[in-house]
Amino acid sequence: ITLNPMFAQLNLKIKLLRLVDQQYWYLKLDNGLTVYLSRSQPSIQVERLLDVYSDVIASKVSMVDYVDLRYAHGMAVKFKKRIS
């Protein structure tokens, strides 16, 4: 899959790309963000992330544990637990 050009729009690069158990893609971006994609249509899922990244995720990326894009019409964002 050729996803790096898509992430380049946000000045991001894929640092690690792994197919897990032949079921889903695990991506680690150079800014530390972890992204999960389904095996089918990963570019459509990345487009969904690109649509909201600048407005929603970019300013909070250090607090995000992962973004899961394996849903048909949305995504899940898991935030890291705060240590007090």
Positions of PLM-derived features:
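Charged, solvent-exposed interaction patches on well-folded alpha/beta domains
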Residues: 1-84
